[in-house]
């Protein structure tokens, strides 16, 4: 959609209860690890979300905030009234630069240790369950009082409410076991409590798994029944994720268990080797089940959606109502503005190498590998929008290195480089990107036999593209003109 008009559905407004979103693009909650151990908003957190707001997604969901005062590392909290003033300042700062609507996600998580031990929902007593329900209600009121447009309840992945929903919840009472009605009980109590506390006119969203993606976990069939229950209890939108479970996580000795290291973690954050839109079918099935029962709750789909063409096709085909983009909007927060303005050809595309995920796994501050090394946030577009240019007589060099194709190019003083490849007479396809300091790329996705051609495009801070350098061609076993 290079230089084309903005997609008509993607930039239509959508109403959620009394809240109108200016477009259908959602920035889902992402861990940043930018706050202090005390859970307060600091300058880095404020700057990160103001930068996202400048890109103008329809809805921006702030990272999960603990509803309880347990030690959580550098994660935000909403567990006491003392957090409200700084949260209010963050909302005001974002509103000052953008029409984006702002929600906050709230979460309860169980205890884990470096030994690999973790608390489960089966360990919780009735008093503890009642406290969790109260904590969610209290935190939701704080979110409302801080000025957020909506609150989102975290019921996905490895955390407490998702663990109650899980088929792996083996409690032998009314809060678990084989009966879905029992597994729904605590999440339903939380939703009812939050609705009671925030009132009938305040939007409530729920983020939960469309499937657990683990052995003996629930599938989209259960997820549809869960959606119907949530809709009938007053949820105003449903944001569909997948996986992210402890059950198949890989434990590194001496480190706390991280729930995104197994296959279910791949399903939650699909990397480059998975197809685009991997999890859309989950939202599609859930939405169809809701509509069949006369329930019009909007459904958000997520999971490796990066192009306006794919986003628009999902909306047009009725597979979802809203498009969630996390890593793509981390790579380029200005995606919505660029696409709306007909400049999709200036988007800095996410390469889905999951460096951001690896940083979270190591408890480091989360950033994008495509940013300059000195940047803590995505750089602002420069006033000078001129594209990088290649040096005179620049050429693209290809060589075979142990079954891979090495692509090398000269320095164009660029923010980054896009590597494109085609096989035979097919179209050129973007296969990866590199920061401006990198001047080569090794392509491991090739085989002997076909003729491959490569081009490299340099891009500036605002995504402005140079003319392609190349093409240059190769077959494994030798270079061909």
Q: Residue locations for each model-derived region?
A:
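Flavin-dependent oxidoreductase catalytic cores
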Residues: 1-389
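Pro/Thr/Ser/Gly-rich low-complexity, intrinsically disordered linker/stalk tracts
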Residues: 387-414, 448, 461-481
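Recognizes extended acidic, P/S/T-rich segments that occur
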Residues: 418-449, 461-469
């Amino acid at each position: 959609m290079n230089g084309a008009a903005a997609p008509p559905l993607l930039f239509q407004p959508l109403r959620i209860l009394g809240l109108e979103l200016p477009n259908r693009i959602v920035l889902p909650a992402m861990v940043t690890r930018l706050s202090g151990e005390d859970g307060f908003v600091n300058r880095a957190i404020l700057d990160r979300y103001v930068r996202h707001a400048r890109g103008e997604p329809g809805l921006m969901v702030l990272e999960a905030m603990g509803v309880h005062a347990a030690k959580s590392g550098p994660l935000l909290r909403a567990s006491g009234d003392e957090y409200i003033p700084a949260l209010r300042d963050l909302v005001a700062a974002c509103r000052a630069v953008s029409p984006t609507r702002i929600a906050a996600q709230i979460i309860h998580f169980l205890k884990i240790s470096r030994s690999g031990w973790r608390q489960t929902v089966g360990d919780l007593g009735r008093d503890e369950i009642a406290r969790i329900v109260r904590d969610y209600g209290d935190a939701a009121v704080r979110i409302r009082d801080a000025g957020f447009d909506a609150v989102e309840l975290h019921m996905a992945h490895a955390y407490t409410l998702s663990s109650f929903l899980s088929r792996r919840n083996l409690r032998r009472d009314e809060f678990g076991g084989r009966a879905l009605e029992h597994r729904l009980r605590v999440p339903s109590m939380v939703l009812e409590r939050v609705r009671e506390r925030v009132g009938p006119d305040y939007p409530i969203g729920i983020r939960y798994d469309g499937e657990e993606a683990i052995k003996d976990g629930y599938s989209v069939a259960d997820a549809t029944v869960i959606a119907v229950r949530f809709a009938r209890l007053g949820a105003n939108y449903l944001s569909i994720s997948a996986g992210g479970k402890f059950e198949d996580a890989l434990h590194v000795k001496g480190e706390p268990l991280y729930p995104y290291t197994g296959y279910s973690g791949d399903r939650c954050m699909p990397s480059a080797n998975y197809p685009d839109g991997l999890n859309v079918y989950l939202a599609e099935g859930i939405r169809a089940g809701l509509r069949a029962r006369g329930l019009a709750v909007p459904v958000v789909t997520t999971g490796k959606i990066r192009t306006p063409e794919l986003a628009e096709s999902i909306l047009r085909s009725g597979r979802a109502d809203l498009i969630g983009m996390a890593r793509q909007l981390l790579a380029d927060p200005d995606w919505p503005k660029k696409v709306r303005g007909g400049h999709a050809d200036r988007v800095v595309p996410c390469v889905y190498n999951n460096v951001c995920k690896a940083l979270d796994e190591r408890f480091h501050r989360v950033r994008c590998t495509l940013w300059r090394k000195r940047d803590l946030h995505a750089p602002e577009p420069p006033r000078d929008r001129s594209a990088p240019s290649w040096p005179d007589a620049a050429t693209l060099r290809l060589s075979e290195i142990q079954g891979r194709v090495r692509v090398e190019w000269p320095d164009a003083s660029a923010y980054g480089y896009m590597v494109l490849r085609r096989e035979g007479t097919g179209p050129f396809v973007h296969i990866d990107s590199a920061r401006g300091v990198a001047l080569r790329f090794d392509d491991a996705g090739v085989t002997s036999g076909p003729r491959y051609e490569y081009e490299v495009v340099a891009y500036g801070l605002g995504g402005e593209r140079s003319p392609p350098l190349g093409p240059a061609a190769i077959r494994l076993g030798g270079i061909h003109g």
